[in-house]
Amino acid sequence: MDKRDLEQLLSDVAGGAVTPAVALTRIQTAPTADLGFAQLDLSRGVRQGAGEVVYGAGKTAEQIAAIIKALRDAGQERILVTRLDAEKEARTSELLDNGIDLGYVPDAQLALVGDKPSPTGNGRIVVACAGTSDLPVAEEAALTAEFYGNEVDRLYDVGVAGLHRLLAHAEELAQAQVVIAIAGMEGALASVVGGLVSCPVIAVPTSVGYGASFGGVAALLAMLNSCASGVSVVNIDNGFGAAYQASLINHLSAGTHRAR
């Protein structure tokens, strides 16, 4: 049950189509669904404005398919599955024999079930990544932001090794409501972007780099120690988390954060 379902239920009660007792039962039974291996949070859409997201890593294809089916049966029409590799996606698609299209994007290891919504945010989210090797994380961020109703501008391969590439997009950066800055290696892109814009910057360190990058820890520490004001940092390779936060900011400013 999401916010629209709840509003419809209350409307039905007001119109006499549903009794208060029946409505109460529906609301009381909506919060969770017990699948044995998972307790699905079916009321998250009502509380937070966006339904539960499925984290694919560590789950079997059978578990993912069962979760998707249960969420759809509960009325959640749009479902995001993250960290879903191609082999697991193929098996999950086989198990979804009821016409559910995963909408799989292999570069981002994302599955997007349901139609992409019209943008409802106040402005645009810019997703900027330092190098082509950062694209999987960047696409996870960009597609997640679009999934939650945001207009997204992609600025790819604009790292500090060729600063002119970033400066060529000064206009897009100036018009952004939020910037997601993604970089591995030394992670300098976030600080540079933070010094160019007046909006919030969400930095995403990636695990791209040679030995002393320590799987993204070097970029993480550099971003945490940024001297640029307005830079916040999420975990290594967490494009989803950055995009979700950026979407919240963009929708808060538009007053639509409870209706995504």
Regions found by a protein language model. Name each.
Residues 129, 133, 170-174, 178, ...:
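C-terminal binding/interaction regions
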Residues 168-206:
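Glycine-rich phosphate-binding loop
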Residues 108-114, 151-172, 217-218, 234:
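Glycine-rich oxoanion-binding loops at beta->alpha junctions
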Residues 101-105, 193-216:
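Short, acidic/small-residue loops that bind anionic groups at enzyme active sites
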Residues 62-64, 134-139, 163-164, 183-192, ...:
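Short glycine/serine/threonine-rich phosphate/pyrophosphate-binding segments
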Residues 1-85, 89-90, 94-95:
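Long amphipathic alpha-helical segments
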Residues 121-164:
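Glycine-rich phosphate/diphosphate-binding loop of Rossmann-like nucleotide-binding domains
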